[in-house]
Amino acid sequence: MSWQAYVDDHLMCDIEGHEGHRLTAAAIVGQDGSVWAQSATFPQFKPEEMNGIMTDFNEPGHLAPTGLHLGGTKYMVIQGEAGAVIRGKKGSGGITIKKTGQALVFGIYEEPVTPGQCNMVVERLGDYLIEQGL
Protein backbone atom coordinates (compact mmCIF):
# COMPACT_ATOMS: atom_id res chain seq x y z
CA MET A 1 0.00 0.00 0.00
CA SER A 2 1.36 3.43 -0.90
CA TRP A 3 1.70 6.18 1.71
CA GLN A 4 -0.89 8.16 -0.25
CA ALA A 5 -3.36 5.28 0.13
CA TYR A 6 -2.86 5.41 3.92
CA VAL A 7 -3.76 9.12 3.87
CA ASP A 8 -6.70 8.70 1.47
CA ASP A 9 -8.15 5.47 2.90
CA HIS A 10 -7.32 5.67 6.61
CA LEU A 11 -7.14 9.39 7.45
CA MET A 12 -9.41 11.18 4.94
CA CYS A 13 -12.14 8.53 5.20
CA ASP A 14 -15.64 8.98 6.67
CA ILE A 15 -15.62 8.89 10.48
CA GLU A 16 -17.03 5.55 11.68
CA GLY A 17 -20.79 5.89 12.14
CA HIS A 18 -20.83 9.47 10.79
CA GLU A 19 -21.14 9.30 7.01
CA GLY A 20 -19.83 12.42 5.29
CA HIS A 21 -17.86 13.60 8.34
CA ARG A 22 -14.13 13.48 7.75
CA LEU A 23 -10.92 15.28 8.62
CA THR A 24 -10.27 18.61 6.89
CA ALA A 25 -6.65 17.68 6.07
CA ALA A 26 -4.15 14.95 6.85
CA ALA A 27 -0.57 13.93 6.14
CA ILE A 28 2.21 11.52 6.97
CA VAL A 29 5.51 13.36 7.34
CA GLY A 30 8.93 11.87 8.02
CA GLN A 31 10.60 12.99 11.24
CA ASP A 32 13.11 14.82 9.02
CA GLY A 33 10.26 17.00 7.68
CA SER A 34 9.90 15.27 4.30
CA VAL A 35 6.28 14.74 3.23
CA TRP A 36 5.54 11.06 2.59
CA ALA A 37 1.91 11.70 1.60
CA GLN A 38 -0.70 14.39 2.18
CA SER A 39 -4.25 15.36 1.36
CA ALA A 40 -4.69 18.13 -1.21
CA THR A 41 -5.87 20.38 1.65
CA PHE A 42 -2.85 19.89 3.95
CA PRO A 43 -1.15 23.26 4.59
CA GLN A 44 2.30 24.10 3.25
CA PHE A 45 4.44 24.18 6.38
CA LYS A 46 7.77 25.81 7.17
CA PRO A 47 10.82 23.79 8.29
CA GLU A 48 10.93 25.72 11.59
CA GLU A 49 7.31 24.69 12.30
CA MET A 50 8.25 21.02 11.88
CA ASN A 51 11.38 21.56 14.01
CA GLY A 52 9.20 23.01 16.79
CA ILE A 53 6.88 19.99 16.65
CA MET A 54 9.80 17.54 16.79
CA THR A 55 11.32 19.49 19.71
CA ASP A 56 8.01 19.20 21.59
CA PHE A 57 8.01 15.42 21.15
CA ASN A 58 11.56 15.29 22.57
CA GLU A 59 10.95 17.98 25.23
CA PRO A 60 7.22 17.84 26.11
CA GLY A 61 5.85 21.29 26.95
CA HIS A 62 8.16 23.13 24.52
CA LEU A 63 5.25 24.44 22.40
CA ALA A 64 2.87 25.25 25.27
CA PRO A 65 4.03 28.89 25.77
CA THR A 66 4.07 29.83 22.07
CA GLY A 67 1.45 27.51 20.59
CA LEU A 68 1.79 24.99 17.79
CA HIS A 69 2.21 26.54 14.34
CA LEU A 70 1.50 24.71 11.09
CA GLY A 71 1.18 26.41 7.72
CA GLY A 72 1.02 29.77 9.49
CA THR A 73 -1.96 28.72 11.63
CA LYS A 74 -1.50 28.89 15.39
CA TYR A 75 -3.08 26.21 17.59
CA MET A 76 -3.29 26.32 21.38
CA VAL A 77 -1.56 23.17 22.69
CA ILE A 78 -3.90 21.05 24.81
CA GLN A 79 -3.45 17.82 26.76
CA GLY A 80 -1.58 15.22 24.73
CA GLU A 81 0.60 12.24 25.57
CA ALA A 82 4.19 13.25 26.33
CA GLY A 83 6.51 12.11 23.55
CA ALA A 84 3.70 10.35 21.65
CA VAL A 85 0.78 12.67 20.78
CA ILE A 86 0.46 16.45 20.46
CA ARG A 87 -3.02 17.97 20.32
CA GLY A 88 -3.95 21.53 19.44
CA LYS A 89 -7.14 23.58 19.34
CA LYS A 90 -8.16 26.59 17.25
CA GLY A 91 -11.75 27.79 17.45
CA SER A 92 -14.12 24.93 16.67
CA GLY A 93 -11.35 22.86 15.10
CA GLY A 94 -7.93 21.54 15.90
CA ILE A 95 -5.08 19.18 15.16
CA THR A 96 -3.76 15.82 16.36
CA ILE A 97 -0.19 14.67 15.66
CA LYS A 98 0.89 11.10 16.48
CA LYS A 99 4.59 10.21 16.48
CA THR A 100 5.62 6.78 15.17
CA GLY A 101 9.09 5.27 14.94
CA GLN A 102 9.92 7.10 11.70
CA ALA A 103 7.07 9.51 10.97
CA LEU A 104 4.43 11.93 12.22
CA VAL A 105 0.75 11.34 11.40
CA PHE A 106 -1.23 14.60 11.16
CA GLY A 107 -4.97 15.11 11.27
CA ILE A 108 -6.67 18.53 11.09
CA TYR A 109 -10.40 18.88 11.76
CA GLU A 110 -13.27 21.37 11.90
CA GLU A 111 -16.80 20.91 13.22
CA PRO A 112 -18.84 18.73 12.95
CA VAL A 113 -15.84 16.41 13.52
CA THR A 114 -14.98 16.30 17.23
CA PRO A 115 -11.53 16.28 18.87
CA GLY A 116 -12.13 12.70 20.02
CA GLN A 117 -12.98 11.54 16.49
CA CYS A 118 -9.82 13.15 15.08
CA ASN A 119 -7.74 11.57 17.86
CA MET A 120 -9.24 8.15 17.11
CA VAL A 121 -8.54 8.34 13.35
CA VAL A 122 -4.97 9.66 13.69
CA GLU A 123 -3.91 7.51 16.64
CA ARG A 124 -5.36 4.31 15.15
CA LEU A 125 -3.19 4.70 12.03
CA GLY A 126 -0.20 5.80 14.12
CA ASP A 127 -0.51 2.75 16.36
CA TYR A 128 -0.77 0.50 13.29
CA LEU A 129 2.40 2.02 11.79
CA ILE A 130 4.22 1.53 15.12
CA GLU A 131 3.16 -2.14 15.12
CA GLN A 132 4.62 -2.43 11.60
CA GLY A 133 7.95 -1.02 12.78
CA LEU A 134 7.41 2.30 11.02
Swiss-Prot record:
Signal sequence coordinates: none
Intervals of motif Involved in PIP2 interaction: 84-100
Record's subcellular location: Cytoplasm, Cytoskeleton
CDD domains in UniProt: PROF
This protein's record includes keyword Disulfide bond: yes
Main location (coarse class): cytoplasm
A GO CC annotation given for this chain: cytoskeleton
Annotated family: Belongs to the profilin family.
Subunit structure: Occurs in many kinds of cells as a complex with monomeric actin in a 1:1 ratio.
Protein name, per record: Profilin-2
Organism: Olea europaea
